[in-house]
């Protein structure tokens, strides 16, 4: 899980979702997991 100031889609499987005010990226590639913070 990477914590970044701005999250971006890395590949076409990445999905940007918001869970209680936290922006996250979920993907089939676990190295692409990110959260904004």
Curated annotation (Swiss-Prot):
GO molecular function: structural constituent of ribosome
Transmembrane segment boundaries: none
Keyword Ribosomal protein: yes
One BP term from GO: translation
Alphabetic keyword roster: Ribonucleoprotein, Ribosomal protein
Pfam family, one: Ribosomal_L36
Cited PROSITE patterns: RIBOSOMAL_L36 (PS00828)
One GO CC term, this protein: cytoplasm
Family statement: Belongs to the bacterial ribosomal protein bL36 family.
Protein name: Large ribosomal subunit protein bL36A
